[in-house]
Amino acid sequence: MVQGRQAGGHQGGWLYDEAERITTFELLTQALKLSCVPLIASGGIADAKAVRDALMMGADMVAVGTAFLTTTESVIDELWKAKLLSACAKDTHLTRLFSGKLARGLVNDYLREFADIDGVIKHAQIPPYPELNAMTKELRATAKHLKDPNLMSLWAGTSVDKCRDESISELIDRLLN
């Protein structure tokens, strides 16, 4: 799996923060030079052009994530789904604030309030995963119960603007044509 910075949710682990800033296609180019195993491109892939581009570059497969969250078959919270359907790439941000592990999600009041101690921009010290994840578990559960998207972890990739209220079948058709 070759996952670029555009991917939503928790990111793959890296040894260096600079590597966390590499795009999917930059990372795929590097991986193709060094690897002889099948490669799956992931991150920012949510339309037919991105699928074609990744495959033409040499990826053996692609993984699509965020676009499936708004399908009619998805079981995510309706508030999260509504936020995804009205968002664009600039509404997403890499953060460690919910779990201690780098993840991309929609910016909300929680992320804005604690941006100074996020640890992504200023490398501040915050508890690592899984400690911070355990510390925020009750917050996330309460936010879901209260239907408060400003305290939820609303994971989303930068291709969020490609999300549609459609069936999985319609999404697959759109990805392939």
Please name every model-derived segment.
Residues 1-2:
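A structural preference for short, pocket-lining loop segments at secondary-structure junctions
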Residues 5-40, 46-177:
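Conserved active-site-proximal phosphate/metal-binding subdomains
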